[in-house]
Curated annotation (Swiss-Prot):
A monovalent cation. Ammonium or potassium. K(+) binds at D131. This is Type III pantothenate kinase. The gene is coaX. It comes from the Bacteria. The active site is at D111 (proton acceptor). Its cofactor is NH4(+); K(+). It comes from Mycobacterium leprae (strain TN).
Length: 274
């Protein structure tokens, strides 16, 4: 059993995966709030409570974090509470198996890397990955499995909350599809702006990427998998015209792939690269 921990700015996903390679599957997944000042002891208490008896069956652990302070605590937690369980933390220097063809590879978020890795392994072809998190990341992986870069936009919930916070006439609304793109009240107007506006944003970015990436021109452009993931993806999927696939567990499988690559490359206890 593999413990996978995906820490983002607002929420953390904890997953348990069984099997390996093409036989791997996510058997449990939980979503909890991310606390930037959480301690290793608190993390251990939460995660041990979630996984229960499966704690004794862990054969490995893999984690990423877009919050550096939390990644430090995850490392301490794994060392102290599961010292016999080999683990990999996704950070600069660790073997991911995906070349980063960008100006500064160290700046690329671990979540973006493992998503593209998972998409390439799942579809075996060039792909565009759309991750709907606190930010919307639209990233490109080539037919050779290379990370080519991407675009980052404000997330759906973050944008909606910011609009409400900075306007006296607007309030925080439930993220839901309105009756029509033409809202009949303030709530519906905000929902229409969020749902249809962000769907147009994503479709626009994907379309421009298909045009701008030389590899995607001509017949090859028809062999580009476009996959969505992330907590708010299901809200927008019905309105998206460019997305072909949805994978709720894409990031967890990316973590698994990095763990397996490092397990095969090293003997004994796995360590993160320094």
């Amino acid at each position: 059993m593999l413990l996978a921990i995906d820490v983002r700015n607002t929420h953390t996903v904890v997953g348990l995966l069984s099997g390996s390679k093409e036989h791997a599957k996510v058997v449990q997944q939980w979503r909890i709030r991310t606390e930037s000042e959480v301690t290793a002891d608190e993390l251990a208490l939460i995660i041990d409570g979630l996984i229960g008896d499966d704690s004794e069956r862990l054969a490995g652990a893999a984690a990423l974090s877009t919050v550096p302070s939390v990644l430090h605590e995850v490392r301490i937690m794994l060392d102290q509470y599961w010292p016999s369980v080999p683990h990999v933390l996704i950070e600069p220097g660790v073997r991911t198996g995906i070349p980063l063809l960008v100006d500064n590879p160290k700046e690329v978020g671990a979540d973006r890397i493992v998503n593209c890795l998972a998409a390439f392994h799942k579809f075996g072809q060039a792909a565009i990955v759309v991750d709907f998190g606190s930010s919307i990341c639209v990233d490109v992986v080539s037919a050779k499995g290379e990370f080519l870069g991407g675009a980052i936009a404000p997330g759906v919930q973050v944008s909606s909350d910011a609009a409400a916070a900075r306007s006296a006439a607007l309030r925080r609304v439930e993220l839901a599809r309105p009756r029509s793109v033409v809202g009949k009240n303030t709530v519906e107007c905000m929902q229409a702006g969020v749902v249809f506006g962000f769907a147009g944003l994503v479709d626009g970015l994907v379309g421009r990427m298909r045009q701008d990436v030389e590899e995607f021109s001509g017949d090859l452009g028809n062999r580009v998998a476009v996959v969505a993931t992330g907590h708010t993806a299901p809200l927008l999927l019905p309105e998206l015209h460019t997305v072909d696939h949805y994978d709720r567990h894409l990031t967890l499988h990316g973590l698994r792939l990095v763990f397996e690559r490092n397990r095969e490359a090293q003997r004994g206890r796995l360590k993160t690269a320094r």
